[in-house]
Swiss-Prot record:
Gene: AIR1B
Highest rank taxon of the organism: Eukaryota
Transit peptide listed as a keyword: no
Species annotation: Arabidopsis thaliana (Mouse-ear cress)
Pfam families for the chain: Hydrophob_seed (PF14547)
Keyword Repeat listed: no
Family annotation (InterPro entries): Bifun_inhib/LTP/seed_sf, Bifunc_inhib/LTP/seed_store, Hydrophob_seed_dom, Plant_LTP/defense-related
Protein name per the record: Putative lipid-binding protein AIR1B
SMART domains reported for this sequence: AAI (SM00499)
SUPFAM superfamilies referenced in this protein's UniProt entry, alphabetically: Bifunctional inhibitor/lipid-transfer protein/seed storage 2S albumin
Disulfide bonds: 28-55, 35-54, 71-107
Residues spanning the signal sequence: 1-23
Amino acid sequence: MAPRTSLALFVSLNLLFFTCTSATTGTCPIQISTCANVLNLVDLTLGNPPVKPCCSLIQGLADLEAAACLCTALKASILGIVNINLPINLSVLLNVCSRNAPKGFQCA
């Protein structure tokens, strides 16, 4: 009877501890407008645009999540830009942040 009690206690403690943990998931930030400087669409500067603020916004996201987040932001015109080329701008933002769009991903 002791092994059953020990097993039941072990399983109960495992269930208790594993239900208390949570998975980390990234979220698409609203402050994506900081990426406008990367595209040189808001602040036209010579040289390299500041990429750190933009890339830090999508840092915790997987490549697919980052691409979807930036695509959604570009389509929603959060950047406040009327004429944008979605595939090119998305590619520029992902490349600057050392990210890749998943194969077959289309921002349309």
